[in-house]
Swiss-Prot record:
HAMAP family: ATP_synth_epsil_bac. InterPro entries: ATP_synth_F1_dsu/esu, ATP_synth_F1_dsu/esu_N, ATPsynth_dsu/esu_N. It is a peripheral membrane protein. One of its GO terms (cellular component) is proton-transporting ATP synthase complex. F-type ATPases have 2 components, CF(1) - the catalytic core - and CF(0) - the membrane proton channel. CF(1) has five subunits: alpha(3), beta(3), gamma(1), delta(1), epsilon(1). CF(0) has three main subunits: a, b and c. Belongs to the ATPase epsilon chain family. The lineage of its organism: Bacteria, Pseudomonadati, Pseudomonadota, Alphaproteobacteria, Hyphomicrobiales. Produces ATP from ADP in the presence of a proton gradient across the membrane. It is found in: Cell inner membrane. Signal peptide: none annotated. The keyword Transport applies. This is ATP synthase epsilon chain. Keywords: ATP synthesis, Cell inner membrane, Cell membrane, CF(1), Hydrogen ion transport, Ion transport, Membrane, Transport.
Length: 138
């Protein structure tokens, strides 16, 4: 008899202000310092640095998308906890809110001589544009 049961694990996403998401999930794709990192049930233990980017969470009921900025992930065989400096639930972000956030960040970057940070933020904007199908119009 074939086992078609999907293995789930506990995923927790926490910001400095509050817990953002805690649920049994199928998989999570994290933006780590070494590239995209896919976490599934029974993953080998790992601690990873989280960078500016998009975090995809696959649940039994669908996909959730978060925009995150900096943090750390603690991955065990039974779960994954991610503490991030900043997080936005992309499904709850209106187009107007996104435009305003982009304008504020771009204004802050004007005159910034740190090319590394500028490139990371440009990459992040590109990722948000690619993932804008999940954004909700206000």
């Amino acid at each position: 008899m074939e086992n078609n049961r999907v293995n789930h694990f506990l995923f927790e996403l926490v910001s400095p202000e509050k817990p953002v998401f805690s649920e049994q999930v199928v998989s999570v794709v994290l933006p780590s310092a070494s590239g995209a990192l896919t976490v599934m049930a029974n993953h080998a233990p790992l601690v990873a640095s989280i960078v500016l980017g998009s975090m995809y969470v696959l649940t039994s009921s669908g996909e959730k998308l978060f925009a995150v900025c900096g943090g750390v992930a603690n991955i065990t065989s039974s779960g994954c906890s991610v503490l991030v400096e900043r997080v936005v639930v992309v499904q709850h972000l209106s187009f107007h809110d996104l435009e305003q956030r982009i304008l504020r960040v771009r204004a802050t970057l004007e005159g910034d001589s740190n090319d590394g940070i500028s490139h990371k933020i440009e990459d992040f904007f590109h990722q948000l544009k690619v993932g804008d199908a999940g954004l909700t119009e206000a």
